[in-house]
Amino acid sequence: MEQYTTNSNSSTEQIVVQAGQIQQQQGGVTAVQLQTEAQVASASGQQVQTLQVVQGQPLMVQVSGGQLITSTGQPIMVQAVPGGQGQTIMQVPVSGTQGLQQIQLVPPGQIQIQGGQAVQVQGQQGQTQQIIIQQPQTAVTAGQTQTQQQIAVQGQQVAQTAEGQTIVYQPVNADGTILQQVTVPVSGMITIPAASLAGAQIVQTGANTNTTSSGQGTVTVTLPVAGNVVNSGGMVMMVPGAGSVPAIQRIPLPGAEMLEEEPLYVNAKQYHRILKRRQARAKLEAEGKIPKERRKYLHESRHRHAMARKRGEGGRFFSPKEKDSPHMQDPNQADEEAMTQIIRVS
């Protein structure tokens, strides 16, 4: 009979599982015996535990410490070696290959992210912490592989990345405003209204933005869903640059006064007169004395005549005196007159 022998030592924290012979019983059931030296029995000085597993299905062996070891029915040897900072590294041979697969056991209070990053999570005392880790989704577009990872943490927590950055998750404001976390890949231009981004936190995790497309990081933006937000009247655009933090550019939006067409080519005196007429017209429209709808132009004939007139610099109309003056004449016409004078003299 083959036995799975488990040696547990609290001082060295080493766990060695050796595989021997497995005896098959009737009905396709395999008996596995676990021997633990930490607990002593009456007869042989060792306590024997027997597990019944179905042949052909993955075997799951639970050893001391709450660690789970799985195998596909093949004889395996698992060795757990204590690592640095209270971590345990397990080496498991991979079927079909000659190498060893290392499994790093993460202690409680720590999150292991794909890519070798470890996030330390510390919650406040007396609060129930709930951590939801979503599996990474891989999307292949035009030969480029992009991997996105999202970690949603409910409750106020402090997370620390492998680079030493400290991230504070604050889902609820002091006024009870519910915050919404949005995770987007840093692969293009992100446009967010400035009103929604007021008082938000921008946190970047993952690889640097100057690496290849496969190692692109993510930017987590915390947006307030409701609350008193002061609209700054601008649009915030986050453009990934060469640094680790994306650059933020603010573009002014057209206001109510810019949406209405302004008269062109007027001086200061005319502009002030236009403003006075607008105020007077708004007052009459509010009183209901004149309709609010205005025609495009008052008289079509005058509009055609104005469009047909010649204009000088700045769109000004030529006065009759300026038309007759020699410096305002057409240069081609002046050349023709000069040639006529030369012919007459000769």
UniProtKB/Swiss-Prot annotation:
The keyword Mitochondrion does not apply. Residues 295-320 bind DNA. Its main location: nucleus. Residues 298-346 are annotated as: Disordered. It is found in: Nucleus. GO terms for molecular function: DNA binding; DNA-binding transcription activator activity, RNA polymerase II-specific; DNA-binding transcription factor activity; RNA polymerase II cis-regulatory region sequence-specific DNA binding; sequence-specific DNA binding. One of its GO terms (biological process) is regulation of stem cell population maintenance. Residues 310-327 have a biased composition (Basic and acidic residues). Residues 298-309 have a biased composition (Basic residues). A motif (Subunit association domain (SAD)) lies at residues 265-288. The modification Phosphoserine is found at S325. SMART domains: CBF. Keywords: Activator, Biological rhythms, DNA-binding, Nucleus, Phosphoprotein, Transcription, Transcription regulation. GO terms for cellular component: CCAAT-binding factor complex; nucleoplasm; nucleus. Heterotrimeric transcription factor composed of three components, NF-YA, NF-YB and NF-YC. NF-YB and NF-YC must interact and dimerize for NF-YA association and DNA binding. Interacts with SP1; the interaction is inhibited by glycosylation of SP1. Interacts (via N-terminus) with ZHX2 (via homeobox domain). Interacts with ZFX3. Interacts with ZHX1. Belongs to the NFYA/HAP2 subunit family. PANTHER family: TRANSCRIPTION FACTOR NF-Y ALPHA-RELATED (PTHR12632). Component of the sequence-specific heterotrimeric transcription factor (NF-Y) which specifically recognizes a 5'-CCAAT-3' box motif found in the promoters of its target genes. NF-Y can function as both an activator and a repressor, depending on its interacting cofactors. NF-YA positively regulates the transcription of the core clock component BMAL1. This is Nuclear transcription factor Y subunit alpha. The gene is Nfya.
